[in-house]
């Protein structure tokens, strides 16, 4: 058995298998000890059909297992890149890469009417695989107040209300007295107003004979006092309102810019509340209230004060007294 001459390394031993002497090249095993096992890549590649999987860079042998995986990830084959693109992921490490890793084509029939050349500062995405159908895959990223694909035809934008819907809306806008009393009973309101801040007078009432008579009291609705006054008072003040003495409150007159002290208490004969201790003198006589005059009131929660104003006068009087000049 003859030994083939060694390639280039000295002090090299070669082992051959006796039964496969005819294919000695395939059974060649090198036992050479060297810093680099691949001084020449062609020496280790015995067969042209075999793929060279051993790295020929000497520093690769000093890398850890994790560093070798990272180095392999940086040099992906075409098959591995195609597999990453198929699953929508990428294991390739780069300093900067196109952020649009996944490119999809969006087809909108309504986008065909858009003219990209007529709009400035418009970015579009096109399908690179089908440049001949570029208009079909056009997607606009232009910033606007509304989507141009929305229907703008008045007949399409909204449905016209039917006769039944119109009747229901009309019924809600014009409530009957029975419905209003039922809402006042449960302290709720379904009446819609455009702006409530412009009209702060939550209580509006017309003067009657009992309001301006010799009874010296103004009867207030229980719903108004419970919702707008009592719920914002401390518990001690709430108890004082329900007692016979009542709670002392300040009433500010907007017309005359004056403050008057009255007492608010619950009327023993009914569930209503009354303003006493100065109502006749401070408001009826001083303001000259008559039957049919409409007054307005509201409770100021921040100052715990009741506000008063004469909204309209009856036909017997032309106008309310003017406020004093500053």
Swiss-Prot record:
Name a GO molecular-function annotation.
Answer: DNA-binding transcription factor activity
Q: Superkingdom of the source? A: Eukaryota
Where does the protein end up?
Nucleus
Keywords tagged on the record: DNA-binding, Nucleus, Transcription, Transcription regulation
| DNA-binding residues (ranges) | 216-314
Question: Could you tell me which SUPFAM superfamilies the record lists for this protein?
Answer: DNA-binding pseudobarrel domain (SSF101936)
UniProt keyword Transmembrane present = no
According to UniProt, the name of this protein is B3 domain-containing protein At2g33720
């Amino acid at each position: 058995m003859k030994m083939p001459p060694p390639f280039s390394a000295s002090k090299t031993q070669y082992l051959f298998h006796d039964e496969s002497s005819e294919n000695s090249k395939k059974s060649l095993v090198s036992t050479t000890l060297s810093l680099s096992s691949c001084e020449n890549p062609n020496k280790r590649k015995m067969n042209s059909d075999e793929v060279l999987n051993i790295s020929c860079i000497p520093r690769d042998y000093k890398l850890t297992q994790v560093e070798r995986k990272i180095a392999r990830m940086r040099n992906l084959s075409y098959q591995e890149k195609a597999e990453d693109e198929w699953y929508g992921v990428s294991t390739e490490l780069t300093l900067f890469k196109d952020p649009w890793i996944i490119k999809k084509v969006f087809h909108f029939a309504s986008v065909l009417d858009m003219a990209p050349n007529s709009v400035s500062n418009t970015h579009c995405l096109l399908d690179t695989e089908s440049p001949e159908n570029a208009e079909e895959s056009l997607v606009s990223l232009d910033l606007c107040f509304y989507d141009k694909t929305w229907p703008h035809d008045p007949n399409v934008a909204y449905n016209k209300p039917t006769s039944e819907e119109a009747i229901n809306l009309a019924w809600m806008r014009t409530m009957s007295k029975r419905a209003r009393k039922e809402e006042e009973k449960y302290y709720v309101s379904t009446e819609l107003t455009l702006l409530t801040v412009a009209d702060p007078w939550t209580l509006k009432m017309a003067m009657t004979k009992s309001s301006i008579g010799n009874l010296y009291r103004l009867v207030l609705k229980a719903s108004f006092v419970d919702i707008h006054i009592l719920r914002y008072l401390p518990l001690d003040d709430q108890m004082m309102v329900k007692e016979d003495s009542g709670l002392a409150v300040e009433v500010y007159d907007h017309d005359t810019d004056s403050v008057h002290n009255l007492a608010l208490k619950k009327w023993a004969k009914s569930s209503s509340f009354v303003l006493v201790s100065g109502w006749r003198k401070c408001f009826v006589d001083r303001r000259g209230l008559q039957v049919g005059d409409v007054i307005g009131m509201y409770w100021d929660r921040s100052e715990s004060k009741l506000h008063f104003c004469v909204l309209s006068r009856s036909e017997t009087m032309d106008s309310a007294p003017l406020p004093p000049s500053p």
